Amino acid sequence: MGIMKEISVKALAKINLGLDVVRRREDGYHEVKMVMQTIHLFDRLEMKKTAGGITMTTNLSFLPTNENNLVYKAAKLLMDEFQIRDGIDVKLHKYIPVAAGMAGGSTDAAAVLYGMNRMFELGLSKEELMQRGVKIGADVPYCIMRGTALAEGIGEQLTALPPMVKCPILIAKPQISVSTKFVYENLKLDENTVHPDIDRLVEDIRRKDLAAITSDMGNVLETVTIPNYPVIACLLYTSP
């Protein structure tokens, strides 16, 4: 079989079925407990071998195409570790909403790791790709794993769950961008905070009880986002 010179990879978006923040660690990170699910909304990445270096283009002019993009960081990580002499050109066709909490950047990075592993015949297993992915971002290992999963720690401790019940979903993205840093800095974890029951949600998923799943879904970060961005409440409580 000839050496692969180019590859096209889908980068699937994810949603959080439930998200709780357990505590703030001394190093500033937050420990979370959440259930994540990949969905059939995706970016597409076309990767091609070149003579050398990393080049990147995208259909969205405001996205960086240098080391400030996780796509670039993922490519550089593998090129440095395996001393790859060839270069790579990445064309990113971006369809996942930006700054929407759908892991758009992380899933693109995961797609690059997957694609380069195949193109350059690095022989890395899924688990080995996930180990490298966490160096780029906490969500990257999950975006390599995909499916339905419980995430703990800072999001990198993953437990696979049975597949989610198939159902239609409605994605609503208002014309705002919410800073993750702002949300976590303003999150108050005290006795008055209402936390979603992630353990119960996991059991709902195991039982494939869609009514219970929808009832037990929740996101503790809404205690920050809704007061600061009222449009989110409008979407939550007026959508069909």
Residue ranges, per PLM feature:
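ATP-binding N-lobe of GHMP and related small-molecule kinases
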Residues: G2-A100, N117-R118, L122-M130, M164, ...
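Gly/Ser/Thr-rich beta-alpha loop segments that engage phosphate groups in nucleotides
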Residues: D20, H30, V71, G101-T107, ...
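Alpha/beta catalytic cores of group-transfer enzymes, especially the acyltransferase/condensing modules
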Residues: G123-V178, P230
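Short, small-residue alpha-helix embedded
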Residues: S106-M119
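Conserved small/polar residues in nucleotide/adenosyl-binding loops
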Residues: Y237-P240
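Short glycine/proline- and acidic residue-enriched helix-loop micro-motifs
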Residues: A211-T223
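A short core secondary-structure module
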Residues: I176-V194
